[in-house]
Amino acid sequence: MENYSSNCYGFMHAGLLNSEDEFYLSRDEAFEWINGIKALDKKLNKIQWNTSDTIADCLSENNENKYNIIEIFDWDKKSQHVAFLDYDWNFYDQDGPDWPIRLWENIEDLLHEYKNMLWWTAYYQIHILNKDLSTKVENFLDEL
């Protein structure tokens, strides 16, 4: 799957389906069928490790599944990016077509990237996946 071409929402959608198909989707298209996922909704803290600690607390409280989703928003709460997030603080994503798939990178790197890009005004959500979806994501990522 080296040539996998998708945006971040399409990559997430493919993972939730455990599909080898490539998708280029809007945020609404990617999320429309997974209603009911619980979410933690917070503002990115200017002190990055405070955000990391909050995410770690959320993951430790919801550690029954290996994978969840982190979604990052701009000041207007418009979604900017999604990535899979495991309980070891690693994220897995694809930014856009022909961009490399990032696997097993530390969430601190993603937070730093978006904190700088969105000038300290971004929000984030943690979407907690159910066991079935988490397993599909695990199988999808194992095949990459």
Predicted stretch roles:
Residues 71-74, 82-107:
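Catalytic Cys-His active-site segments of thiol-dependent hydrolases/isopeptidases
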Residues 1-50:
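Cysteine-nucleophile protease catalytic domains, especially the papain-like/related folds used
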Residues 52-84:
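Active-site-adjacent substructure of cysteine-protease-like catalytic cores
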Residues 27-30, 40, 55, 107, ...:
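Short amphipathic alpha-helical segments that mediate assembly, nucleic-acid/protein binding
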Residues 102-144:
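Noncatalytic regulatory segments and standalone regulatory/sensor domains
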Residues 21, 44, 75-78, 89, ...:
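Intrinsic-disorder/low-complexity loop/linker signature
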Residues 15, 33, 43, 58, ...:
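Residues that form generic nucleotide/phosphate-binding pockets
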